[in-house]
Amino acid sequence: MKKENITYGKVHQVIGPVVDVIFTESSQLPRIYDCLSVKLAGEELFLEAAQLIGDDIVRCIALGPTEGLARNEKVTNYNHPIEVPVGKNVLGRMFNVLGKPIDGKEELPKKPQLPIHRKPPSFDDQSNTLEIFETGIKVIDLLTPYARGGKIGLFGGAGVGKTVLVQELIHNIAKEHSGLSVFAGVGERTREGNDLYYEMIQGGVIDKTALVFGQMNEPPGARMRVALTALTMAEYFRDHDNQDVLLFIDNIFRFTQAGSEVSALLGRMPSAVGYQPTLATEMGQLQERIASTKTGSITSVQAIYVPADDLTDPAPATTFTHLDAKTVLDRNIAALGIFPAINPLESTSRLLDPNIVGINHYKVALGVQNILQRFAELQDIIAILGIDELADEDKIIVERARRIRNFLSQPFFVAEKFSGIAGKYVPLSDTIQSFKEILDGKHDDLPEQAFFFVGTIQEAVEKAKRLKKATVEEK
């Protein structure tokens, strides 16, 4: 950094996370998004320029706590946006919003670094082909396929397997696609981030992952920008290393919430439900950078908190417009012991189209959904009258639906140490063929238990033989 590029100002006023800085000359004023710093309790507090007020004052958002900051403190303007480390060095490491390591390991080299505010790929560079991103997880690949370079919303409460699903996706892209993952913890619990870090070490996927955290105890400035820090790291892998990158954002709602916290202090008039008037713009600036190019892709999985379960709330509603697929984790399915506990009827994807996935995949997926839908409709009758009162045709549907429901379960690699069952990666072609055979009634003679926690249909057949043998031996 050249010395002549640096200019100096003074703290004019402090209102919570918003700091006004005054400069003596207008030529010294920073540009919007420029990075500034001020000494506070022996450490550097970083600020980001957000508004220019009058001829000599710039209003900034603090990226750390402002307690103890006094007027007339000297402020350094670096004349460039926040820059964070990128490249292979960030893998296996954990960072804060400024790209500084928070895992207690050695500092990273100064280069390469990139600014966190960047333009999305141009139309010429973006890939215009819709392509399925194979995850190896049956229920996802069949019923709610993910797009390469797409955006997926992950809806799930506490304890339904959201973290395990995230880890399995990271594992599968690392092992099967030689891909990389970047995890952004936005405004969530510090304990959860800590648990995730150590679980990734145990699962053997940390070396293919970079983690960036701006947790809920941090100021709104950090929570607003941490997703951009993670995205910048992912963009480097996509653009320079031509990699397929998986970007996890947990939780995208906290990104919106942080913007809402500082919006009023920046003097903006609140819009619907008290959100910032720039909500759609801020969301668009983040989401448009998550894209697939001709050489690599960023596929994002975004956990979404829905305030008061109101899907019409402006924050989730603004996010929905950008999503390609919706994966819903259901507590009732988890209660049955079926994992991943994905609701096959509520989860959707715009890729489930015969022109994209092919007519065979589409027909099988539709057949599975129809049977499960009919099974759901028959549940009340079964509960009141019993299964014996159903028509023969409905009895067959119920039996097949139970087999399908069990077969949608799958042993995960990252859960091997808990379940004692070896993890399975199931190619899409095997998934389609397996469910087609169940729909055609080829395996109506197999017990329902044989379909539980297996990979392909061949494994279910083998498991049925083992169950039969065990039953004979018991007798």
UniProtKB/Swiss-Prot annotation:
Subcellular location: Cell membrane
UniProt entry keywords in alphabetical sequence: ATP synthesis, ATP-binding, Cell membrane, CF(1), Hydrogen ion transport, Ion transport, Membrane, Nucleotide-binding, Translocase, Transport
GO terms under cellular component: plasma membrane; proton-transporting ATP synthase complex
Residues noted as binding ATP in the record, renumbered to the chain: G156, G157, A158, G159, V160, G161, K162, T163
Membrane topology: Peripheral membrane protein
Similarity annotation: Belongs to the ATPase alpha/beta chains family.
Enzyme Commission code(s) on record: 7.1.2.2
Enzyme class: translocase
SMART domains: AAA
Listed HAMAP family: ATP_synth_beta_bact
GO molecular function terms attached to this record: ATP binding; ATP hydrolysis activity; proton-transporting ATP synthase activity, rotational mechanism
Keyword Nucleotidyltransferase assigned: no
Chain's role: Produces ATP from ADP in the presence of a proton gradient across the membrane. The catalytic sites are hosted primarily by the beta subunits.
Transmembrane regions: none
Subunit relationships: F-type ATPases have 2 components, CF(1) - the catalytic core - and CF(0) - the membrane proton channel. CF(1) has five subunits: alpha(3), beta(3), gamma(1), delta(1), epsilon(1). CF(0) has three main subunits: a(1), b(2) and c(9-12). The alpha and beta chains form an alternating ring which encloses part of the gamma chain. CF(1) is attached to CF(0) by a central stalk formed by the gamma and epsilon chains, while a peripheral stalk is formed by the delta and b chains.
UniProt source species: Mycoplasma pneumoniae (strain ATCC 29342 / M129 / Subtype 1) (Mycoplasmoides pneumoniae)
Catalysed transformations (reactions): ATP + H2O + 4 H(+)(in) = ADP + phosphate + 5 H(+)(out)
UniProt-recorded name of the protein: ATP synthase subunit beta
